Amino acid sequence: FPHPTTIDRLLRQWRGSASGDAPDLDALYMATLTLTRMADGGLFDHVGGGFCRYSVDQYWQIPHFEKMLYDNGPLLALYAQAFLATGDDYFAAVANATADWMLSDMQSPQGGFYATRDADSEGEEGLYYLWTPDEVRELLGEADYAVFASRFGLDQPANFEGRWHLTVHRPVEEVAADAGVAEGDALAAIERGKQALLTARAGRVPPERDEKQLAAWNALAIRGLAIAGRALEREDLVDAAVRAAEFIRSTLFIDDRLLASYKDGEARFPAYLDDHAFLLDALLELLQARWSSEHLHFAVTLADTLLENFEDTAGGGFFFTANDHEELIHRPKPLADESVPSGNGIAAFALQRLGFLLGETRYLDAAARTLRAAWRAMDEYPHGHVTLLTALEEYLGHPEIVIIRGDGDETGRWRDAAAKLYAPRRLVFAIGRDEPSLPGALADRAAVDGDTVAYRCLGTHCELPVTSWEALAASLSESN
């Protein structure tokens, strides 16, 4: 199984040590090698983009072919962040392909995202994704086929029940050298091959799609698209994230209560901890890509609901079900990361960030109570509680928050320039000069007549505002 929270933790570990005397290059190596092997192997759909659920072999060649929204949202964010951290275009290409698949295959007309693509079609596992050399040769022609087959193992023995599931077998430079062509020409042949196979595959019977639209899983997709939109400079990804957030706000938020699921025109089931926490976290990422006072208000409503309806006021942390949910024999309070991040970990992480953004101690105190309640679990089993450890890191060393006020174009340019840096503990918000009254501490981050102004704070400590990009860039460089 992919473990995005663990790989994210490694990237954060490297970044936190990078400016010191002993940068943790092992953490960076482990993260980037894992991401490369995942993208080279059979987990990744090399034709259509997106990741399958898990590998069934130790070499990560053959997957269980089901594609889950809750995997692809976090993996999209992770590959985009890896691109920022390393500048490696391969990570950007994987992120772009994953995002393209999410938008083309998984986003509904209403704006939300569907839950899954099944593994089998026509009664066979993986049939939709498999090829034979003869099929590919006929589609590509001999010259492009020679390059494509060498790259993706079609010149090797079949790897899945007499057919070929594409995995990267050789680096492009070796493929080009063997074919006697320039590396750029080899890359072009590979891309032509992918497009030809994608077109041919569109004529096959696709796996069934589970068209439930789940609040928690949509939140993971919104977060991934918002992060990738900033990192890859793709406004279409931000547009898609905004559409999904608006779908949830208009369709799943009824009578001031969030619902968990939508299908066939009906929103159902009271939402759980994960729905509220994941969506709060996603909105904080989306606000950095595109400011919206409505989305900030929605985030505040979700945070207040967490405290009022989910918090264990006696022991700290958050229950999975709300106070008015049907009574259970045991009311769980999940702490560990599983197939999705820990709801308690994301709640603590996002509440801290919102608390520092607004100067709201209620959120900071609730996050601290959660971390104290989870301390024994983190201490005894740290690799099972990585999301909580990340929240603990930001509790011990507060997040850096940059507020940029001014005219839209200029504030956007400052924000976009700041977003080119991999700084996982930094939040950058560009808020227009004419934005209506802002809540909490944001009210003190006023626009200045005639100038763009930036306010930089570390936790509750704020520097003097600056009115030039050069001054802000110098401040950001010092904090890296």
Region locations from a protein language model:
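Glycan-recognition and catalytic cores of secretory/periplasmic carbohydrate-active enzymes
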Residues: 1-480
